[in-house]
């Protein structure tokens, strides 16, 4: 269980700052993939018509988790940076701090 606070004071690479300042933390989420990327256009063209599946479908998945990526936005200059954390099964943003001697809760 990884619990990350919603704000953190860290170095800002922005041209105005270039010093440690407060950052707002959110979790990175991949955007919607474009239908007009060259590979997708080629794939759709190949798939159309008769003949079933034309390219191999990947089945040998090895990983059970993904790396968590944090998106840090500077409060002063609004510059965004990304920071990758280690792999974890449970990730929490701004959760309660854990007390000593209490059971884990998901």
Curated annotation (Swiss-Prot):
Q: Which UniProt keywords apply?
A: Ribonucleoprotein, Ribosomal protein
What is any one GO biological process for this UniProt entry? Answer: translation
Do you know which Pfam families this protein is assigned to?
Ribosomal_L44
Q: Give TM segment ranges.
A: none
Task: Return the GO cellular component terms, semicolon-separated.
Answer: ribonucleoprotein complex; ribosome
Query: Recorded GO terms, molecular function?
Result: structural constituent of ribosome
InterPro entries assigned to the protein according to its UniProt record, in alphabetical order = Ribosomal_eL44, Ribosomal_LSU_eL42, Ribosomal_zn-bd
State if Ribonucleoprotein is listed as a keyword.
yes
Name the family the entry cites: Belongs to the eukaryotic ribosomal protein eL42 family.
Give the free-text miscellaneous remark of the entry: Cycloheximide sensitive type.
What protein does this entry describe? Large ribosomal subunit protein eL42P
**UniProt organism field:** Candida maltosa
């Amino acid at each position: 269980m990884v619990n990350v606070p919603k704000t953190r004071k860290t170095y800002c690479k922005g041209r105005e700052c270039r010093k440690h300042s407060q950052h707002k933390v959110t979790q990175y989420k991949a955007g919607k993939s474009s239908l007009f990327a060259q590979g997708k256009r080629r794939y759709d063209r190949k798939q159309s018509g008769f003949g079933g599946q034309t390219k191999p479908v990947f089945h040998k998945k090895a990983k059970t988790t993904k790396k968590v990526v944090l998106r840090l936005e500077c409060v002063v200059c609004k510059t965004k940076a990304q920071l990758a954390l280690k792999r974890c099964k449970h990730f929490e943003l701004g959760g309660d701090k854990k007390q000593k001697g209490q059971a884990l809760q998901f």
